[in-house]
Amino acid sequence: KNVAYDVNDADVQVILLVEDSRRFYSAYLPLLYTQLVKQTVRLMGEGGNLDEKLLRLRARAKILLATDMQSARSIIDRYHNNIIGVFTDGKFPNLGSSRDTAGLELVKFIQSRHSNTPILFQSKNLELKEEAESLGVRFLHKEDTALYKRIAEFMVDKMGFGDFIFRSKEGEEVARASTLTE
């Protein structure tokens, strides 16, 4: 309910999860939320009073769930400037087009508008891996025993959920900060 207000007035960021399997989104949502809260708490550090900390916690990124192509595109069109990452299934309802390749179609849709958006493509269908990776997105098999660990790693590596790393023009790390006060 508050997403439109938070994005428009407070410039809050958005993470999009595209998944039609209740089993998987019921597992992913708590994982994503836990990572968000950990990142927010880590960034807050020790400074600030309780009101400031509560405000920062409220301003954390919002996770939006889409269970079909139309919902996913609507969210992307509406919040495109604030999307910091997309987690998409390979197969989900896609009115008028193939359900089996909906995830690939969504990746192409996102990249045609926002080429730098980090995208994690997950599927049980290993046949989609090569094409997903050829589009420059990370592929995870949904039955990987380390799936949740790899999702958390993706958030750190690609979405900035880790230390702030300052690099030289050559790409070498010159400094690192774990909190805003560092």
Stretch-by-stretch model annotation:
Residues 11-23, 28-52, 63-65:
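Conserved acidic segment of CheY-like receiver
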Residues 87-96:
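Active-site residues of response regulator receiver
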Residues 1, 86-87, 105-133, 137-140:
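A short, hydrophobic beta-strand element within the central beta-sheet of small alpha/beta folds
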Residues 64-67, 139-146:
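Short acidic-hydrophobic, aromatic-tinged amphipathic segments that line or gate anion-handling sites
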Residues 43-85:
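Acidic, metal-coordinating helix/loop segments flanking the phosphotransfer/catalytic sites
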Residues 68, 96-105:
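Acidic catalytic/metal-coordinating carboxylates
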Residues 1, 27, 128-133, 143-159, ...:
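C-terminal output helix
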Residues 2-30, 159-182:
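CheY-like receiver
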